[in-house]
Amino acid sequence: MGRKRSASSSRWLNEHFKDPFVQKAHKQKLRSRAYFKLDEIQQTDRLFKPGMTVVDLGAAPGGWSQYAVTQIGSKGRIIACDILEMDPIVGVDFLQGDFRDENVLAALLERVGESKVDVVMSDMAPNFSGMPSVDIPRAMYLVELALDMCKQVLTANGSFVVKVFQGEGFDEYLREIRSLFKVVKVRKPEASRGRSREVYIVAIGYKY
């Protein structure tokens, strides 16, 4: 006998399938509505140009990589990583593994190689328990790891876009990013649900 869904999970599913961006993504055969979040950021901040090298953290199911491919073209390169499986995308070199694992990080850095990266993007999020006191620190740990990745691979004047959940540690994290990049904006794309704590920090012009 199947388990009954909780009221909160049933509400989430109902909201999810009624979401116009979910419906639009399905209609256009896109991986996820995250595609539209990155599109809106690109229209405003112009992160991507043809021929760029991009790292995509928390890539599955592939919405961001799918969008970035359309912007960087056949001469560009995307190295993507996620703990979950992801169906192949032409132009994307995908590594499945837990980014928190040092061996996975080493494998990712090996794929990047000697060349510097133009854009690091992170849509990583932990499995949420529903308790902010647990979830926010887990989420902050992931975004700190993404910023550490920037410090290792990002080219001078490179860019970083990262999903962050507002809560304890957010202001300090934003302050650190502002010390490393010339221009920093906090964006809330239309495709991001209004009641979600998520925002996107867009950082341009890496100083080092």
From Swiss-Prot:
GO function term, MF aspect, one: rRNA (uridine-2'-O-)-methyltransferase activity
Catalytic EC class: transferase
Gene3D superfamilies listed in its UniProt record: Vaccinia Virus protein VP39
Record localization: Cytoplasm
Record's keyword annotation contains Ribosomal protein: no
Entry annotated with the keyword Ribonucleoprotein: no
A Pfam family reported for this protein in Swiss-Prot or TrEMBL: FtsJ
Keywords on record: Cytoplasm, Methyltransferase, rRNA processing, S-adenosyl-L-methionine, Transferase
InterPro entries per record: RNA_methyltr_RlmE (IPR050082), RNA_MeTrfase_FtsJ_dom (IPR002877), rRNA-MeTfrase_E (IPR015507), rRNA_MeTrfase_gammaproteobac (IPR004512), SAM-dependent_MTases_sf (IPR029063)
Binding site for S-adenosyl-L-methionine: G62, W64, D82, D98, D123
Catalytic activity reported: uridine(2552) in 23S rRNA + S-adenosyl-L-methionine = 2'-O-methyluridine(2552) in 23S rRNA + S-adenosyl-L-homocysteine + H(+)
Active site: K163
EC number(s) stated in the UniProt entry for this protein: 2.1.1.166
GO cellular component: cytoplasm
Similarity remark: Belongs to the class I-like SAM-binding methyltransferase superfamily. RNA methyltransferase RlmE family.
Role, per record: Specifically methylates the uridine in position 2552 of 23S rRNA at the 2'-O position of the ribose in the fully assembled 50S ribosomal subunit.
Protein name: Ribosomal RNA large subunit methyltransferase E
Species in which this protein is naturally found: Actinobacillus succinogenes (strain ATCC 55618 / DSM 22257 / CCUG 43843 / 130Z)
Gene: rlmE
